Amino acid sequence: MSDQFDAKAFLKTVTSQPGVYRMYDAGGTVIYVGKAKDLKKRLSSYFRSNLASRKTEALVAQIQQIDVTVTHTETEALLLEHNYIKLYQPRYNVLLRDDKSYPFIFLSGDTHPRLAMHRGAKHAKGEYFGPFPNGYAVRETLALLQKIFPIRQCENSVYRNRSRPCLQYQIGRCLGPCVEGLVSEEEYAQQVEYVRLFLSGKDDQVLTQLISRMETASQNLEFEEAARIRDQIQAVRRVTEKQFVSNTGDDLDVIGVAFDAGMACVHVLFIRQGKVLGSRSYFPKVPGGTELSEVVETFVGQFYLQGSQMRTLPGEILLDFNLSDKTLLADSLSELAGRKINVQTKPRGDRARYLKLARTNAATALTSKLSQQSTVHQRLTALASVLKLPEVKRMECFDISHTMGEQTVASCVVFDANGPLRAEYRRYNITGITPGDDYAAMNQVLRRRYGKAIDDSKIPDVILIDGGKGQLAQAKNVFAELDVSWDKNHPLLLGVAKGADRKAGLETLFFEPEGEGFSLPPDSPALHVIQHIRDESHDHAIGGHRKKRAKVKNTSSLETIEGIGPKRRQMLLKYMGGLQGLRNASVEEIAKVPGISQGLAEKIFWSLKH
């Protein structure tokens, strides 16, 4: 405990009501956030002679100030605690590093409903199925559904402005409701109902209805229709045979935990209508000395009580660990969801099987993560030895990408002790330079990146410049001219030139723009980490450049047409589904776009044709 913090005087002012407390260090930084049913009793426990753990001892030794917020109920305290944790990211709290919203499959409420992937708030009218663990799982499911039940997946702006069916209709992936006469209202509605049942886990009902329709078509001598329905039946059966399905058909999340070498993995299985939609592993940031019970309790609270997760609560949550506040958590989640949420820790039957699966996946993911970290650590240690540095905790690498000097993009990628830190990757659009001048581009991106205040923890130990002597000279000049408060001499600037024939393993490294460089053996772990970060930077730059080039390609031909400004250009591309759709459109179709007159439509039509 800080000598300047008077615990006895502070505790005299604390109430016995429920609430949340924030602990600050001498620098005014929040280092811990906690909740309590009885604030006075809970805070008093920090200042006893015998503390529960070394982590608590280290925490109390740094306390300079404590702020208290009283709440009406324990539920309010629980919610406020996790909001504060997300806001302050305190050093001594367990932190969930990934709180992104989960994607859903959206079936719209349009006259001719469409299927799409959806993230975020559910404002649009329609039905939502999920959550799925990631966007890939949704896209894979949508592609599968399109093959079995060919309902539309196009945007409404494209759908409303079509006069003839698109390629999806030609290859049998859409029934073509955009064009009158291609499919009856009854048939389209039937396919939509199949999708609804399928996504709700009612595969048996889908098969029963399809078999009945196939038999009817066969009896009516409609053999082509019967064969088409037969193919649908076989496709549905192939899908359902691949997946373990619980007999109960419940909605639940199953949370398994593994803990080793100071690292925790929490694995979540998403089960809806008895089907495993997918799973995801999380590696929360765990302060040293933290008990596993605190890891699980904090993770579950942050996972379900923060933002978008409150929208995806299942009816039941299975845990691999018995929580002391299990009842409070269940009551809080039920209150927020407006319905009963059960939290179970000792399931039987299928539920026990699910929990075992989650536990196994958590252990496997943790083993893989520790192995990866070990490899990264070995490589960074080897690099520090080669560069004669005490250690390398953080590296940043820069690369430039353009096409004949146009649409220049610079990338910055970041590695820490665990490898790529993708949340901190950045791209910079380079402007105001002579086209193709890579030196000026490097000069600009380095000034934008480092010519401002930087937190001490974000100052890299090594800055890698992809490009060799010339680019390294630019970096040296920039750092010599920087007027900043942080230690600009701390980062080591290292140039990397590609070898002969641009082959991996033949790179030359430079400490200075003048003089000879040096090379590392192809099997050197230090070289491997340099290659890894350089390749990441190169890929990140090219990805940004391609996006920028595609954007220009889609608009450049329209920019030359008099009377077409940014708003009209955007409207045309939106309603026509892109530049290709606009090129294929007739004058009458173009004239239907809001803000486009008949005369302007003719001008656009002939400009794009010639």
Swiss-Prot record:
GO terms for biological process: nucleotide-excision repair; SOS response. Belongs to the UvrC family. It comes from Escherichia coli (strain UTI89 / UPEC). Keywords: Cytoplasm, DNA damage, DNA excision, DNA repair, Excision nuclease, SOS response. Residues 16-94 form the GIY-YIG domain. It is found in: Cytoplasm. The UvrABC repair system catalyzes the recognition and processing of DNA lesions. UvrC both incises the 5' and 3' sides of the lesion. The N-terminal half is responsible for the 3' incision and the C-terminal half is responsible for the 5' incision. InterPro entries: GIY-YIG_endonuc, GIY-YIG_endonuc_sf, GIY-YIG_UvrC_Cho, Hlx-hairpin-Hlx_DNA-bd_motif, RuvA_2-like, UVR_dom, UVR_dom_sf, UvrABC_protein_C. GO terms for molecular function: DNA binding; excinuclease ABC activity. It comes from the Bacteria. This is UvrABC system protein C.
